Amino acid sequence: MKVKIVTPYGIVYDRESDFISFRTVEGSMGILPRRAPIVTQLSVCDVKIKSGDDEYHLKVAGGFLLCDGKDVIIITEEAGREEDISPDRFMEARERVERVRRFFQSSL
């Protein structure tokens, strides 16, 4: 399956992958190829992606995940390897995600 992670600053990850795991606002989950379609809200979390013998770990500042059964797309304010992310920019993105989450929860 193709996994793509997109931020306002560009595409952070775009590769064929065998497995992806992450944390949603409801708990942790993973996706294998040919999974049933899903749209979910991500928590601030570490995304683990397996591609063959390689394993990638990327931090995401919340966002949304869409899986159509063939491809997985993550849309987030900030993402990258921990050592590459500006802590200030990551915290600002996290705060924006939390404000949006609180707004939508109060609207329900």
Swiss-Prot record:
Keywords: ATP synthesis, Cell inner membrane, Cell membrane, CF(1), Hydrogen ion transport, Ion transport, Membrane, Transport
MF term (GO), any: proton-transporting ATP synthase activity, rotational mechanism
Membrane topology value: Peripheral membrane protein
PANTHER family named among the record's database cross-references: ATP SYNTHASE DELTA/EPSILON CHAIN (PTHR13822), ATP SYNTHASE EPSILON CHAIN, CHLOROPLASTIC (PTHR13822:SF10)
Family membership: Belongs to the ATPase epsilon chain family.
Subunit and interaction comment: F-type ATPases have 2 components, CF(1) - the catalytic core - and CF(0) - the membrane proton channel. CF(1) has five subunits: alpha(3), beta(3), gamma(1), delta(1), epsilon(1). CF(0) has three main subunits: a, b and c.
Name of the featured protein: ATP synthase epsilon chain
Taxonomic placement: Bacteria, Thermotogati, Thermotogota, Thermotogae, Thermotogales
